[in-house]
Amino acid sequence: MNWRSERIWIELITGSRKTSNFCWACILFLGSIGFLLVGISSYLGRNLISLFPSQQILFFPQGIVMCFYGIAGLFISSYLWCTISWNVGSGYDRFDRKEGIVCIFRWGFPGINRRIFLRFRMRDIRSIRMKVKEGLYPRRVLYMEIRGRGDIPLTRTDENLSPLEIEQKAAEWAYFLRVPIEVF
């Protein structure tokens, strides 16, 4: 959801609470539980999962490896669930032409730098940069070049925008901020 007027433009950024992250977290959790149960059932010699008889899987080496994969999968899925619950990467970009200020806010991981807040003047913005990398895995990212701070990304690196969409976004931002567009 975005909100735009003549003087203020607020763009909300979705963080890690995306459908794909929910799907990956569920798949990893269920798969790792399955691996762990198969490894434990091979150790106990009893069927905890009816799909695999425990006599077919030896504890050494298959059962140990299955337990290891199950535990590793649980760690990775718990990491994904934590990033989803903390909504890491979400926030907003606020461009205020009236005040001449740009504010970029993002939620990070818990700790000292949980809230990432950048604030700078519009007159410090040199240009909107469009980095395009074509090939097998194309990547198109928009950056805002700021005097003294370098490039700040405006679009996510995992957003798969078409060339037309990225050009339109760059043109809208450049028009609103009254800065040139650079392509790299």
From Swiss-Prot:
Membrane topology note: Multi-pass membrane protein
Q: Which compartment or compartments is the protein found in?
A: Plastid, Chloroplast thylakoid membrane
Q: Which Pfam families match?
A: Ycf4 (PF02392)
Tell me which Gene Ontology terms the entry assigns under biological process.
photosynthesis
Q: Does the keyword NAD apply?
A: no
Q: Which sequence ranges are marked TM in the entry? A: 22-42, 57-77
UniProt keywords (A-Z) are:
Chloroplast, Membrane, Photosynthesis, Plastid, Thylakoid, Transmembrane, Transmembrane helix
Its main subcellular localisation, reduced to a broad class, is plastid
Q: Which InterPro entries match?
A: PSI_Ycf4_assembly
Top-rank taxon: Eukaryota
For this record, an example GO cellular component is:
photosystem I
Summarize the protein's role: Seems to be required for the assembly of the photosystem I complex.
Name the family the entry cites. Answer: Belongs to the Ycf4 family.
**Record's protein name:** Photosystem I assembly protein Ycf4
Q: Which gene codes for it? A: ycf4
